[in-house]
Amino acid sequence: MADATLTRAPEGATGVLVLASGDVIWGRGFGAEGEAVGEVCFHTAITGYQEIMTDPSFEGQIITFTFPHIGNVGANHEDVEANHAHALGCIVREDVTAPSNFRAAEGFDAWLKARGKIGLAGVDTRALTRRIRVGGAPNGVIAHSASGSFDVEALLEKARAWPGLEGMDLAKQVSCEAHHLWEGGVWKLGFGYEGAEKRPSTSLGTSGDSSGEGSLVPSEVEGRSFKPHIVAIDYGSKHNIFRNLVKAGAKVTVLPATATFDEVMAHQPDGFFLSNGPGDPAATAEYAVPVIRQMLETGKPLFGICLGHQLLALAIGAKTTKMFQGHRGANHPVKRLADGRVEITSMNHGFAVERDSLPPNARETHVSLFDNSNCGLELTDCPAFSVQHHPEASPGPMDSMYLFEKFVGQLRA
């Protein structure tokens, strides 16, 4: 890592990462040209880079992929978790320029470029990951210019001026703009996600495109005449969450993050879902928590994932805290306390619920086997539960998929 006094890239370098600490990391730029400032984190998944880049929870973040080769299977028009890429950019050891997969429509480089996202290759990602692990997730600027000319001092000032994710509400930026009915199921070999989703184009988010990515096939839930109605609050949800709620047999209506309790109840829900999303839960809680508390008072079942888990905790009086460096990967072991079962899970969070702040009516249900942090809770006085990890995977293992069936089962009871 170089000193920030350098303003001209070394020979062959067309990209740079400038950290707020003053570290300058040179590499080869790919994807779109430009610059972006945000929090630099790392993700340990081997595959699923498309799903990761399009996960709304990565709004405001620059991802370091720890697996050395990224882009092996190219990119397609289906493996996305939102209608555009939310991560600011990515850092890789080596980007694969000759992908091989029967579903590939283009290379990762072209995919990033089409979405205005910056890539930086040729980086010692092991060293950068160690730096994040030891020093915490830093603010930084990623930049790509074919000319190789960068004003490093100016980039450093931008990195240092960026306020950071703590105290930042990003859910409003990535939430849908209007309510819509989610129709569809999971991906099927030979069919993919055929057919257009029946929802207005205005509800795709503030930066949505019209590419049709993530479109779904109609749900087929055999032997279930009653479909309980879930109102899902979209704080930045992944598509695969809604797919699996529908697969479990529910009807899902999605509402914006700022929906009021009256707007929620106007849809006559049987239960409530709180989605994942980016930013500081304490900031989002200012408008989300009053609504969640009213939801709990109805006595109807409630399920939360990731940010939704944190918001439920805040609604019952618990506290959240910024992690030194978050959990982001597809192989995180979580222990289910009820029976000792270990579930391998997908995780993506930089904030956590403080276990010691949980009130008496909250029971801890899951813990991380990496650092013993809280990963789940349930209330003893009403049918509400939540988990910090991502049972919908995408990418990742499916050990926790039963949670969708559990929730829909509560709605049918």
Where are these regions (language model features)?
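Residue-level structural signal for beta-strand termini and adjacent loop
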Residues: G29-G31, P68, N348, L379, ...
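A glycine-centered loop/beta-turn motif at secondary-structure junctions
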Residues: G376-A413
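Cysteine-nucleophile active-site neighborhood
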Residues: G271, S275-A352, G396-L411
